[in-house]
Amino acid sequence: MLRHVMDSYDPAGKKHYAGNGQAAGDEDGREEFLKDVCIPIGEASFPAPFASGLEYSSPVRGTWNIVHTGMLIPEAHEIFICGAGCLRGVVLTAAEMGTQERFSTVAVREHNLLDGDMEELVIDGVTDIINKLKKRPPAVLVYTSCMHHFAGCDLDMIYARLRERFPDIDFTDCYMNPIMRKSGLTPDQLMRSRLYTLLKERDIRPDEAAIIGNDLPTDEDSDLMLLLKENGFKIHEITSCRTYEEYQEMAGSRFYISYYPSAKAGGDMLSQRLGGTHFYLPFSFSYDEIEDGLRRLSDVLGVPAPDFSGKRQACEEALEETLSLIGQTPVAIDYTFCPRPLSLARLLLDAGFNVERVYTDGLTGEEKEDFDYLQAHFPQLLLMPTVHPKMRFLAAKEPSDYLAVGQKAAYFTGTDHFVNIVEGGGMIGYEAVLRTLSLMREAYLEKKDMRTLVQIKGWGCESCV
């Protein structure tokens, strides 16, 4: 393991600070520089420990974006309509995925705004693209942008016209709209809900369940999958659909189950539209919360609750095994690894691990109990943002001895010993605890090429990079 040295510089380039806790120069200046980006949880506010403002984007690209997620609908074609500058990122994503044949763009130019023909541009642009495709897609995802909202475009009319022109194609509205990030549904919530708007009503089958809202497939040996399989349910998941017809079969499911927080709103919408029952199973590292969620799900499904005997003991033994291996190695966790980083920090700290940092830009309501507990019992735990402008100067320049759980924690601490998973990686239940600990042991023993891996877009999806 390597010595931790995190070098950082002030924006003016006049002072040098050593991120290992030893001042190199003006200690008062260092403390002033760090005070709003390095907050002990005992002094932090909930749910927004950091001020919102200008944001920094690190070169960590493992989380999925709207291009990756839309491609989960098999055989569908994506059409993005926005300015050329904004198109650059999504075009590169499609190219990196090797899915250019399922991806098209329409560039909005200044004269379109001035001439007031934004609606016509969308309708005619989409029409031209569809007519030139070698194969007619069963579905088209049309992504409009903030420009259409600023211009007051009649989106309902646009989609009505497209459906009239192409009655054999299913259209849905998707958005590349950063102005929606601070109110209403977030872009992530909205995109996950759009995945299921194309499902058409059909007869409901009582012995079928759909796991919805995930970018990554649910682990086959997770508590959720075992519960469904052991009780004879046919399981649908968009990640396993290979044809558009397979995708449509999800509509007949009696139960919709989500466990990623951003998928909850979409599950409620789907239930209201198609009539199935939606159940949200919270992702957590708390034994009590895991068992409570699975018991409540069993009640909804009308099946016996799982047998939890031995599960807690197995987790405790895995914690002891992992702690005996890594000892007091400093641990950093970030929100890209899973939706409940504070829950993981609480589990590890209670077991004696040396968790020093959690990288997160905001906290969800589900984390309030863990936040309060950590404030009371581990007030020294540091919360650090990932998008604050000062973080540009706080990424480690030299390798460190940290064990990181998550890509952004690895990047900011500069370690090659890290768990390389995003969005929970398909884990849920007790299996999430056991698999996370196994991955931590693996990360401690084996180095990865952090700076190369974290720059690959969309961990777990197709990539030709």
Question: Predicted regions span which residues?
Answer:
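An N-terminal assembly and electron-transfer interface module characteristic of large anaerobic redox
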Residues: 1-465
